[in-house]
């Protein structure tokens, strides 16, 4: 169950927000195999001066329109899957929302199943184990 935070420039229209969210989610479904209904995203806007970055780090020329995609997910995806994810997110955001691929900054934070609670104050792993035992 990934949880995704997306930081976008202030003033992004609701239609572009929806396109960004959809583009990121579709990339995760295709590249790392998450279920279609495993959709948890938090979009937040940043204002000029709130996000400071090097415009040419590692030879990538960035503009004021940088979108930061932070995905927290369980361990276990291969480097090939991660490469595919990065490429798909950049391509989807370019096609769906007109965001330059150079302005798509993605990072992953991996953890374990026991690090999640998706509701009711219960560890998600316990809920999954209960369901498996009852099936």
Show the residue positions of the predicted features:
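A domain-level signal for the structural core that forms small-molecule/cofactor-binding pockets
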Residues: 1-135
């Amino acid at each position: 169950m990934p949880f995704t935070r997306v930081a976008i420039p202030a003033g992004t229209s609701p239609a572009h927000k929806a396109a960004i969210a959809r583009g990121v989610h579709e990339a995760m479904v295709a590249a790392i195999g998450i279920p279609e209904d495993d959709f948890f995203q938090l979009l937040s806007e940043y204002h000029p001066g709130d996000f400071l970055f090097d415009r040419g780090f590692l030879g990538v020329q960035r503009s004021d329109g940088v979108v930061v995609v932070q995905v927290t997910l369980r361990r276990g995806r291969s480097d090939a899957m991660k490469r595919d994810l990065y490429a798909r997110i950049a391509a989807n955001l370019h096609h769906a929302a007109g965001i330059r691929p150079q302005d798509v900054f993605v990072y992953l934070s991996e953890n374990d199943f026991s690090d999640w609670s998706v509701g009711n104050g219960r560890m998600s792993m316990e809920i999954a184990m209960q369901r498996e035992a009852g099936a």
